[in-house]
């Protein structure tokens, strides 16, 4: 278990990163990054720059635990070294970045490599608005994305505006029912269930 003070940052950087425990960064940021080179910049103890410079041949970020960043942000990133590499983001746990105060971030991003990467989602992603705040922002991106049955996504706000979930793959198939029939897609039932708790934007590049 890892917990920071308010505004703190946790950055786990390696070719393969796995989390099965809990990481709590109130008003702060958590990075789980598969890469060989990352540039960090700090000012007065706060992270001001986080740039993934170089990927790896076989990269993996695997979160089966709980990451909580109230008013903050959570980033799971896997960058490939080249087009013959592999970079995968797996999320089967809980990610929560609710907005509970004014000007809060409330952001969750799962980013596999956009050329050869894969992002697999079967867990919970919550970026809701509390105390009158708008819902947050969730993004799942990679060349291929699999949104599995049982995935829970919510950017709801009882007193504010519902937030947005962006699904951004190279290509994507919406299949009948809950099963995924291609290497990148979501079941229509799973998507329908998601639309009850978040706005969804599907964009392909």
Name the predicted role of every residue range.
Residues 1-205:
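Extracellular and secretory-pathway beta-repeat/beta-biased strand scaffolds
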